[in-house]
Curated annotation (Swiss-Prot):
This is Ribosome maturation factor RimP. Residues 178-190 have a biased composition (Acidic residues). NCBIfam families: PRK00092.2-2. InterPro entries: Ribosome_maturation_RimP, RimP_C, RimP_N, RimP_N_sf. GO terms for biological process: ribosomal small subunit assembly; translation. Required for maturation of 30S ribosomal subunits. The lineage of its organism: Bacteria, Bacillati, Actinomycetota, Actinomycetes, Mycobacteriales. Residues 159-190 are annotated as: Disordered. Belongs to the RimP family. Its main location: cytoplasm. SUPFAM superfamilies: YhbC-like, N-terminal domain. It comes from the Bacteria. GO terms for cellular component: cytosol. It is found in: Cytoplasm.
Length: 190
């Protein structure tokens, strides 16, 4: 019997993920011949810790072992955070990315700036200029695509201040990007 569909995996684990305090960001099921992969992306406002993700991975594995959907086919289970390349599509993504630099594509222009506070249906974006950083409000419905950018140097303290700082439990931009600590992955081969 093949690995179950994305929808079935979501049905099996969504309550467990939510009870553990995480948001289920995505599920990907990859069929690769006789050995398939199930990748589960989770996140939370407080970020992810490796030990907690390892525990969640083991609990998800137990759920999969308790149902017949997986049959005898081998598969790899990977529980991970979305990582830096994920587009910002939900309000919670904007909240969690506060203080990070992002490329924001609008209908007629592209804005690159530091994500600030979310207020209703708009977000503050701190844009650097020759006279110093400035705050611009951008309506969420006007955003066609937004992706956090990798930073290799420490952010300007004034930009961070105008952006409202870094959310509690999140890693400062250059620290996360340089160390690779932002994406947490726990995998199991079954």
């Amino acid at each position: 019997m093949p690995v179950p569909s994305k929808e079935r995996v979501t049905e099996l684990i969504s309550d467990l993920v939510q009870r553990q305090g995480y948001d289920l960001e995505d599920v990907a099921v990859t069929l690769a011949g006789r050995h398939s992969a199930v990748r589960i992306m989770v996140d939370s406002d407080a970020g992810l810790e490796l030990d907690a993700v390892a525990n969640l991975s083991h609990e998800i594995s137990e759920v999969f072992d308790s149902v017949s959907d997986f049959g005898e086919s081998p598969y790899t289970l990977e529980v991970t955070s979305p990582g830096i390349g994920r587009p910002l599509t939900h309000e919670r993504h904007w909240r969690r990315a506060r203080g990070r630099r992002a490329r924001i594509d609008l209908a007629h222009e592209t804005v690159v700036g530091r994500i600030g506070l979310l207020d209703g249906d708009s977000v503050a974006v701190v844009i650097g200029s020759r006279t110093g950083p400035e705050v611009r409000r951008v309506a969420l419905p006007d955003i066609q695509k937004a992706v956090v950018q990798v930073e290799f140097s420490k952010p300007d303290p004034r930009e961070l201040e105008l952006a409202g700082g870094i959310p509690e439990g999140r890693v400062a931009p250059a620290d996360a990007d340089a160390s690779g600590d932002e994406e947490v992955v726990e995998g199991l081969d079954k």
